[in-house]
């Protein structure tokens, strides 16, 4: 083997770990979310059917979510600050609405609560363990709301 062939052989051997890593893609599905998570989110809201120029007011939520690993979830506790606009109210409901979720192989998905407003979030799950979820609310309209949920057990 001449010097050029040795260089090619060494370069090929050194690049094998990189090629192996490139072939291992992270995949997700519904069972990546199991256990109890705490969601902290904030943003802005305004009354339903508000027209242009209607002021936005702050809103925040702290919520406990129990993911069952099968596409369903329950909400054993929720506290919402200023949920209905500029009232300043803080609601501490004993339980929130149940819901469902769907996670794609690329770790993106949706989460929907079975409440009167069908509150829905676009989500992204942190692979490989699913211990963090990033969320942005997509329904109902007149909400700009985002946050993250962290597995606590």
Short names for language-model regions:
Residues 9-18:
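Bacterial N-terminal signal peptides
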Residues 1-10:
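Bacterial N-terminal signal peptides that target proteins for export
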Residues 21-153:
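Mature soluble binding/inhibitory domains
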């Amino acid at each position: 083997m001449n010097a050029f062939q040795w260089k090619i052989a060494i370069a090929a051997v050194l690049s094998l770990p990189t090629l192996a890593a490139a072939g291992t893609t992270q995949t997700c599905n519904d069972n990546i979310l199991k256990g109890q998570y705490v969601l902290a989110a904030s943003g802005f809201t305004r009354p339903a059917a508000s027209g242009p120029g209607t002021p936005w007011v702050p809103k925040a939520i702290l919520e406990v979510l129990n993911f069952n690993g099968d596409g369903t979830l329950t909400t054993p506790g929720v506290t919402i600050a200023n949920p209905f606009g500029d009232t300043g109210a803080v609601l501490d409901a004993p339980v929130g609405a149940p819901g469902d979720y769907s996670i794609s192989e690329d770790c993106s998905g949706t989460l929907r609560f079975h409440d009167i407003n069908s509150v829905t979030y676009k989500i992204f799950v942190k692979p490989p363990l699913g211990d963090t979820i990033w969320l942005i609310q997509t329904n109902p309209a007149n909400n700009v709301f985002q946050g993250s949920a962290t597995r606590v057990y």
